[in-house]
Amino acid sequence: EGSGGSGSSGNFTTASNIHMSSVTNTSIAGTGGTGTGTGTGTGTGTGTGTGTGTGTGTGTGNGSASSNYRGGGVAIQPVTLTESLLNK
């Protein structure tokens, strides 16, 4: 904004008043977002086992056997001894 002056001898004088408004830049720092995460996991396992065993046993037994044999005998015939047989 300025105003000019007047001059009578051909001299021109100019006076100027310049007003500038100051500009202030304000920056706002941004904030980061938040995040959440979930995770699942599974696990498997195997196992083996072996075992051995022995066993013994005893046993008793009773047995009997009998035999009855009746065989026919030879019949003994009576012999008559005579004098003629004895003298031979």
UniProtKB/Swiss-Prot annotation:
Residues 30-62 are annotated as: 16 X 2 AA tandem repeats of G-[TN]. Residues 30-62 have a biased composition (Gly residues). Phosphorylated with a circadian rhythmicity, probably by the double-time protein (dbt). Phosphorylation could be implicated in the stability of per monomer and in the formation of heterodimer per-tim. Sequence repeats lie at residues 30-31, 33-34, 35-36, 37-38, 39-40, 41-42, 43-44, 45-46, 47-48, 49-50, 51-52, 53-54, 55-56, 57-58, 59-60, 61-62. The keyword Zinc-finger does not apply. Residues 79-88 have a biased composition (Polar residues). Residues 23-88 are annotated as: Disordered. It comes from the Eukaryota. Keywords: Biological rhythms, Cytoplasm, Nucleus, Phosphoprotein, Repeat. It is found in: Nucleus; Cytoplasm, Perinuclear region. Its main location: nucleus. One of its GO terms (biological process) is rhythmic process. One of its GO terms (cellular component) is nucleus. Forms a heterodimer with timeless (TIM); the complex then translocates into the nucleus. The run of Gly-Thr is implicated in the maintenance of circadian period at different temperatures. Deletion of the repeat leads to a shortening of the courtship song cycle period, and thus could be important for determining features of species-specific mating behavior. Essential for biological clock functions. Determines the period length of circadian and ultradian rhythms; an increase in PER dosage leads to shortened circadian rhythms and a decrease leads to lengthened circadian rhythms. Essential for the circadian rhythmicity of locomotor activity, eclosion behavior, and for the rhythmic component of the male courtship song that originates in the thoracic nervous system. The biological cycle depends on the rhythmic formation and nuclear localization of the TIM-PER complex. Light induces the degradation of TIM, which promotes elimination of PER. This is Period circadian protein.
